[in-house]
Amino acid sequence: MKKQEITLTYDFICPWCWIAERRLARVVDDLGLADAVDARIVPYELNPAMPVEGMDRNAYRTAKFGSWARSQAMDAHVAEAGRAEGLQFHYAIVDRTPNTLLAHRLVWFAQRNGNASGLVDALFGAYFRDGRDIGDAAVLIDIAAEAGLDADAVTAFLASDEGTTEIRALEAEAIRQGIGSVPSMQIGQTVITGAQPDAVFRDAFADAVGALAIIE
């Protein structure tokens, strides 16, 4: 049977992307589709103008949301939603808002080499659970190695500009397709925006599998 293609548009500083990724993975497992789907990660930088070195998270979030207290309230809401999915958000140790271009390039590299499995979740966990700076190349090399990628190959890749043009093109195409926020997931002909309940993913897979059966 032909594999069901799914497109996942994420940014690795988006907490709802991690929550959506966990819900989607659970549904895929529950439906026994782990070997029947072909997932493609599409990059989307929420902060494309972020300095390469990132910013102090307190300063950035205070400026963005008007106060640190408001930012903390939003973080608490996310952490509660994450706990329901078995995810740990340790915002107290997250002190940087990183530029995520390097992280997106790393995933692009891993997908090209057929070894992106586990890397996406590892990046989310490194940032939200462990407070690691995923805008730092040395940190990304460690995360990649922990996820099973060759550290020397990743080091050479991140030291180059390879993939940057492709990332920009993928982001531009996503915007042309009407994607204005993340997470955004396409399963068959169904586009799902936001961290929706499991039932929404189940319905999308039911529609997509039914369409594939008709085609075949």
Where are these regions (language model features)?
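C-terminal cap of thioredoxin/glutaredoxin-like
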Residues: 2, 6-13, 19-37, 41, ...
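Structural alpha/beta surface segment adjacent to cysteine/selenocysteine redox centers
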Residues: 22-130
